[in-house]
Amino acid sequence: MTRYKAIVAYDGSNFFGFQVQTKSGVEVQRTVQGELNKAVNQMAKQPVTPIKVVGASRTDTGVHAFGQVVHFDLPFDINPVGVSKGLNTLLPRDILIKAVTKVSDDFHARFSTHAKRYFYRVSTTAFTDPFKRHYTGHFHWHLDTSRIQEALPDLIGEHDFASFAASGNQTASTVRTITSAQLIEKPDEQELVFVFEGNAFLYNQIRIMVGVLLEIGNGRREIHDIQRLIAVKDREQARFTAPASGLYLDEIDYGENPAN
């Protein structure tokens, strides 16, 4: 068996998230992993033991990706370019294999990660743009972006982000490290882009952080309310969760290991 690593982009609008959802062994919803599994197994001529594609991040319904990473094992050794072309021929148009490389057998798309970067797009138009509604969150109330810029550093560092974890979070620890939190302002496009980098993120953490930051910008919260939320460890006090449509998995870093 030969292990391959693939960088995958997808439009999450018509998927019920990345992870396969089954009932009695039958897929019940359309997922990114489900489509990748079908394409990989078709390329491998439907082996007796089905091949499972493993993803680095289990993005939610409606979340997009430019740089999702997956790995899978094929029962033959062929040029990665051929794997990429073959899969793109078999996959639906809302998924694209951007690159494929061979990796060592101990590479794991999820457990070998060093860091992840996500960004979140916010449309600030007065009314929802029908051409952006699946690709941005919409916030039409007044925003003082200087307040947001002042608040962002409060997220940096290692913290217990329990207040920023949705009820579906299944990780044993809610401690995470954020290395970068930025706001890019695009006035000509009436858009804001939040960019977050960290070692890992909790379930819905980025969407909750964006919700809190927007409320800070709107004056509904004190500028340094993030410090209080980190201290109280109470999800109910974070309130607003930004919609999934604005969230993008941008890039996953696997460190310096050449096998990755």
From Swiss-Prot:
Primary gene name: truA
Keywords: Isomerase, tRNA processing
EC number, UniProt record: 5.4.99.12
Root EC class: isomerase
One example of a Gene Ontology biological process annotation: tRNA pseudouridine synthesis
The UniProt record lists the keyword Isomerase: yes
Record: active site: D60
Family matches, as InterPro entries: PsdUridine_synth_cat_dom_sf, PsdUridine_synth_TruA, PsdUridine_synth_TruA_a/b_dom, PsdUridine_synth_TruA_C, TruA/RsuA/RluB/E/F_N
Name of one Pfam family that matches: PseudoU_synth_1
Catalysed conversion reaction: uridine(38/39/40) in tRNA = pseudouridine(38/39/40) in tRNA
Biological role: Formation of pseudouridine at positions 38, 39 and 40 in the anticodon stem and loop of transfer RNAs.
This protein's record includes keyword Protein transport: no
Entry-linked Gene3D superfamilies: Pseudouridine synthase I, catalytic domain, C-terminal subdomain (3.30.70.660), Pseudouridine synthase I, catalytic domain, N-terminal subdomain (3.30.70.580)
Binding site residues for substrate: Y118
Family: Belongs to the tRNA pseudouridine synthase TruA family.
A molecular-function term among this protein's GO annotations: RNA binding
NCBIfam families in the record: hisT_truA (TIGR00071)
Protein name in UniProt: tRNA pseudouridine synthase A
Top-level taxon: Bacteria
Quaternary organization: Homodimer.
